[in-house]
Every structure is written in structure tokens, then in C-alpha cells.
């Protein structure tokens, strides 16, 4: 069973906690959030320096904060991924193994989602870690697609525009 820690409590982090909590094959180890003090589903910590060991750390913060947050993770040689569609994995500190776990979806905390319909774009520095991210996607019943940074950079604005357009037209 893969142990996962989510870092960040914005829209994406909130929904990833739901996704991983609902999986019988993933152990949601903890949720690091500056703004949430308690969640009955998972241990919540407020300081990144207090993280416990997990197999994967998923950084789900603003693009401009990814590097700073990854620098604060005290462990070495762990798989650390971010959820950004427009940031390369090499923005993560290289003391850890690096990758991307990017859900191709616009998120809102007030929106209920069918998580199993959300495609996950994955990328990793090594083939071994890519296999781990494939397993992580499969274990939460999501389809995954191997997409590198250049492809993701092109896909991100197109998908963002498409996914945020109204789905009904008023005549």
C-alpha cells in the first residue's frame, strides 16, 4: 500500500484528499495545511517541518510556491511530485526524486466530481518513479497519461480554457 502525504489545502489539495481517502489501495498518511486544523479522515499537520515519512509527497500549492515548499521537506530520496500543469518537475528540490501528478481538471471545493473520470498527467525523472505514479493513478481508478513538460505546457492553457467554459448555452 502506497503511503501518501498531501501538502496544500487549495482546490486541488482538497480534492486529492477526497480521492486518496476513498481508495482502499492508498494510505492517506497526512495532510499538511496552514489553514485546516482538523479533518476526521486524516491526520492534519500545520508545519511542513513536522511531516512524517511517506512514500510520496504531493505538493499542491500555487506554482510560485512549489520550489519553496519542496525545499522545506526534510527527507531525502523520497518521491516528491507537484500538481501543476505549467511547472517543470525540476522546480522541485533535487535532494528527492521528482515528478508530476497533474489532474487535468478545473477544481472548486464546492463542486462534486466524479474522480474516476479525471485524467491524470504524469511525468517522473526515472522510469522506476514513473511506474510508481502509474500505480498511484491506477490504485485510485484514474486513467493516466505520460506527458512531458513541453506537452503539458501546451495542454495546460487549452484544457484550462476548455474546462472552465460554461457547458450550457442560453439563446
Label each region the model flagged.
Residues 58, 79-81:
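N-terminal transmembrane hairpin
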Residues 36-41, 51-52, 72-75, 89-95, ...:
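Short loop/helix-cap segments at secondary-structure boundaries that form the rim of catalytic
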Residues 82-156:
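Rossmann-fold dinucleotide-binding core
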Residues 161-170:
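Conserved small/polar residues in nucleotide/adenosyl-binding loops
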Residues 1-46:
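NAD(P)+-binding Rossmann beta1-loop-alpha1 motif at the extreme N-terminus of oxidoreductases
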Amino acid at each position: 500500500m502506497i503511503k501518501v502525504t498531501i501538502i496544500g489545502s487549495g482546490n486541488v489539495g482538497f480534492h486529492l484528499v477526497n480521492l486518496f481517502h476513498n481508495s482502499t489501495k492508498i494510505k492517506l498518511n497526512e495532510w499538511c495545511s496552514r489553514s485546516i486544523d482538523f479533518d476526521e479522515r486524516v491526520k492534519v499537520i500545520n508545519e511542513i517541518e513536522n511531516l512524517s515519512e511517506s512514500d510520496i509527497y504531493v505538493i499542491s500549492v500555487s506554482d510560485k510556491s512549489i520550489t519553496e515548499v519542496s525545499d522545506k521537506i526534510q527527507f531525502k530520496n523520497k518521491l516528491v511530485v507537484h500538481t501543476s500543469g505549467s511547472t517543470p518537475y525540476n522546480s522541485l528540490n533535487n535532494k528527492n526524486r521528482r515528478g508530476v501528478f497533474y489532474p487535468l481538471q478545473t477544481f472548486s471545493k464546492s463542486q462534486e466530481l466524479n474522480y474516476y473520470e479525471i485524467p491524470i498527467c504524469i511525468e517522473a525523472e526515472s522510469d522506476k518513479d514513473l511506474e510508481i505514479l502509474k500505480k498511484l493513478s491506477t490504485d485510485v481508478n484514474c486513467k493516466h497519461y505520460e506527458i512531458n513538460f513541453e506537452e503539458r505546457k501546451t495542454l495546460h492553457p487549452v484544457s484550462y480554457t476548455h474546462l472552465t467554459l460554461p457547458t450550457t448555452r442560453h439563446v
